[in-house]
Curated annotation (Swiss-Prot):
Its main location: cytoplasm. The keyword Cytoplasm applies. This is Renal cancer differentiation gene 1 protein. InterPro entries: RCDG1 (IPR031457). Expressed in the kidney, in epithelial cells in both proximal tubules and distal convoluted tubules. Keywords: Cytoplasm.
Length: 113
């Protein structure tokens, strides 16, 4: 995720103090006052916001790790299911062949009419 400093760099720069817009007239009249441009400008009290961003990033990282582990486990189970299906198919083929042989043997022991 983007670093908070990168977010500040990517936001549009404020206009020069010499040309304030009409909505900035009251803020520009006090020297050194903040200039409101209609988008959120991080203030010095942005510490909790940065902490919240870091917490969200950690939660996303934890979720991604958990999802990766879940994918690995699902892949392993999927491979086991495929192997089991193959073995079941082999067993079914064997049982069918065995049944056919038993039937032939039984039929060969019957007296001819």
């Amino acid at each position: 995720m983007a670093d908070p400093e990168e977010l500040q760099v990517s936001s549009p720069p404020p206009p020069p103090p010499s040309s304030p817009s009409s909505s900035d007239a009251s803020a520009a009249s006090s020297p050194g006052g903040p200039v409101s441009l209609g988008w959120p400008v991080p203030s010095r009290s942005s510490g909790p916001t940065v902490d919240q961003l870091e917490e969200v990033e950690l939660q996303i990282g934890d979720a991604a790790f958990s999802l990766t582990k879940l994918l690995e486990a699902t892949s392993a189970v999927s491979a086991q299911v495929e192997e089991l299906a193959f073995k079941c198919t082999e067993n079914a083929r064997f049982l069918k062949t065995w049944r056919d042989l038993l039937k032939e043997g039984y039929d060969s022991l019957k007296p001819d009419d």
